[in-house]
């Protein structure tokens, strides 16, 4: 205590006296990973995790994405929600696969990386699936493949379009060949949809790589990407190390892919619901739907 503090009355706080720290609720403020702006959490969530300052598309959870797609007045039903991963191979790297599963389930709150639902989009039936990158990097294992296949089967039974939002690092190495088999399994499921004349729209988000990009993610009747999403089989650093050349600026980003004919269009996440509704009604030759939000 300084001599000045001794002379000051006890009721008076000096400038150097530490004030009580105010606890800020977790998630109240977030920082944009692109422009660095401080963003108010609830407003960012309402804006579908898109920065209002620079329009940068940040990561969004699968359930939030699907909730923004389906009609509010007709709650969707989840498909194959009870399925969970099994460590058939008893795989172990630095950590046991079984332990990784439990850790991911605890941190993400999901059983696996793909959520599939059946619901309504502006009054018309729709089946949609979305990857949750928070679960082991959105990697594709047996459960992801099975949920995708079952979602396609539901779309086939109902006779409605199928939409999938991809965000994945690729096949899950801890499941070995069981994971790689899902590439053929999901592609075959889409083949049955195509034979029935039902549309499949693939939405590629950041990032869509590996076995997912090499299978159902690029098999859409229409392939849509979110702005500046990384899309490709191997990442740019791996390619540069392999070919020993500097890649073009923006290589493997959605804008580059659109310019080179690899995808059909780019759509802002906030406009995605309307865009998908327009495309599905056109492809199904349905009358233009009434906007359920405006009703």
UniProtKB/Swiss-Prot annotation:
Ranges for domain CoA carboxyltransferase N-terminal: 28-295
Entry-linked Gene3D superfamilies: 2-enoyl-CoA Hydratase, Chain A, domain 1 (3.90.226.10)
Compartment(s) where it occurs, according to its Swiss-Prot or TrEMBL record: Cytoplasm
A single GO BP: fatty acid biosynthetic process
Region of interest called Disordered, as start-end residue ranges on this chain: 1-20
Primary location recorded for the protein, binned into one broad class: cytoplasm
Keyword Nucleotide-binding: yes
Record's GO cellular component terms: acetate CoA-transferase complex
Note describing how the cofactor binds: Binds 1 zinc ion per subunit.
Protein EC: 2.1.3.15
Cofactor(s) essential for the protein: Zn(2+)
ZnF start-end (C4-type): 32-54
Top-level lineage group: Bacteria
Pathway: Lipid metabolism; malonyl-CoA biosynthesis; malonyl-CoA from acetyl-CoA: step 1/1
Molecular function GO terms recorded: acetyl-CoA carboxylase activity; ATP binding; carboxyl- or carbamoyltransferase activity; zinc ion binding
Family as reported in the entry's similarity comment: Belongs to the AccD/PCCB family.
HAMAP family, sorted: AcetylCoA_CT_beta (MF_01395)
Role this protein plays: Component of the acetyl coenzyme A carboxylase (ACC) complex. Biotin carboxylase (BC) catalyzes the carboxylation of biotin on its carrier protein (BCCP) and then the CO(2) group is transferred by the transcarboxylase to acetyl-CoA to form malonyl-CoA.
Name this polypeptide is given: Acetyl-coenzyme A carboxylase carboxyl transferase subunit beta
Species for this entry: Xanthomonas campestris pv. campestris (strain B100)
Top-level taxonomy: Bacteria, Pseudomonadati, Pseudomonadota, Gammaproteobacteria, Lysobacterales
